[in-house]
Amino acid sequence: MNQKRTNDYNFIDRDKLYDLINKKPASKNEISDILEKSLKLKGLSIEDASKLLQIEDEELYQKLLKTAGYVKNEIYGRRLVLFAPLYIGNYCSNNCLYCAFRKDNKSIDRALLSIDQIKMETESLLKEGHKRILMLQGETKGNSFNYFLEALRAAYSVKVGNSSVRRINVEVAPVEVEDFARLKKEKIGTYVCFQETYDSELYKIYHPEGPKADFEYRLNVMDRAMAGGIDDV
């Protein structure tokens, strides 16, 4: 289990959020004003977002989709980036109810790839044309952080003709600032960590056991990642 840091805290006001989504739906004029505001690309308030989530009118919903499409294209452009997942291990100490890798699932085979196997998998992906990878593994003491760093280096070292991996995005369990600083040195792309739910009460239900059961440690992971120098999360 991760040790609790003194500055880990639940900064989400659960009661406020539920109050917002249970309010009377906004009028058409109010929704139109919010959508117009979003076109300025300056962001929306929590209150604005909660009103958009309550839209049931089909005409307003279509307007929402059109506005969202415009905002997406203005920020990201008309492009689609593909990446291939590379699972290097499915041993896990967590018991998340929705996940096939949960420790109580006895119906799957478990594996932890050797460095040579990781190179072989990377070579196969390169031959298929993939140059962007998402590397991930289950969370357990057997899958050490040093092993993960070695796996990154191995994947980056593979060459097939003139092709090599351009970018490895990383989905690894939350760690401390010092380890994030080590991860930064490996020239990773984006650091990814899913919370699954930001409702602390639901979180307890879906994550009953294991390191991931620590809601606040996971909730504050991006603060630690950025403190470690990772600027793409």
Please give the residue ranges for each predicted region.
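Solvent-exposed, flexible loop/coil residues
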Residues: D48, A84, N90-C92, G210, ...
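Short, functionally important structural connectors and interaction interfaces within domains
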Residues: E36, S45, K72, F83-A84, ...
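Canonical Radical SAM [4Fe-4S] cluster-binding loop centered on the CxxxCxxC motif
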Residues: G77-Q117
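Flexible, acidic/Gly-rich N-terminal and inter-domain linker regions that tether
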Residues: M1-F83
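Residue-level signature of catalytic and energy-coupling elements of molecular machines
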Residues: L41, C96, C193
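Core AdoMet radical
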Residues: K103-K119, S124-V233
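Short low-complexity stretches enriched in small and charged residues
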Residues: K4-N7, S38, L53-Q54, G89-Y91, ...
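Flexible, active-site-adjacent loop/turn segments at secondary-structure boundaries
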Residues: K42, L86, N90, E196, ...
